[in-house]
Amino acid sequence: MTDLRHYDVIVSPVITEKSTMVSEHNQVVFNVARKATKPEIKAAVEALFGVKVTAVNTAVCKGKVKRFRGLVGRQSDVKKAIVTLAEGQSIDVSTGL
């Protein structure tokens, strides 16, 4: 049975030109919760997608400073996880969970 906390760890897949380029190297990019750790991300991907994860790299992308009608605001920070899968395994992120 899938633990419901796994759905809180992985927020969404990242579908950009750069993330599709790394998919050639058996890697997938996800937006994850800010407080998620690498072991939690690994467990969530393995449980939700049924694949073997060999490595997890994370990066916190700082939000941009935006101005609207003279007021300064800031976009939220986003944590990205680059998940490396075992040889011969893949995840189709264009379909849902």
UniProtKB/Swiss-Prot annotation:
Recorded GO MF terms: rRNA binding; structural constituent of ribosome
SUPFAM superfamilies registered for this protein in UniProt: Ribosomal proteins S24e, L23 and L15e
Pfam families, per the entry: Ribosomal_L23
Keyword annotations: Ribonucleoprotein, Ribosomal protein, RNA-binding, rRNA-binding
Record flagged with keyword Glycoprotein: no
Domain of life of the organism encoding this protein: Bacteria
A cellular component annotation (GO) from this entry: ribosome
GO biological process: translation
Role played: One of the early assembly proteins it binds 23S rRNA. One of the proteins that surrounds the polypeptide exit tunnel on the outside of the ribosome. Forms the main docking site for trigger factor binding to the ribosome.
Family that this chain belongs to: Belongs to the universal ribosomal protein uL23 family.
Subunit composition and interactions: Part of the 50S ribosomal subunit. Contacts protein L29, and trigger factor when it is bound to the ribosome.
Protein name: Large ribosomal subunit protein uL23
Organism: Brucella melitensis biotype 2 (strain ATCC 23457)
Lineage, highest ranks first: Bacteria, Pseudomonadati, Pseudomonadota, Alphaproteobacteria, Hyphomicrobiales
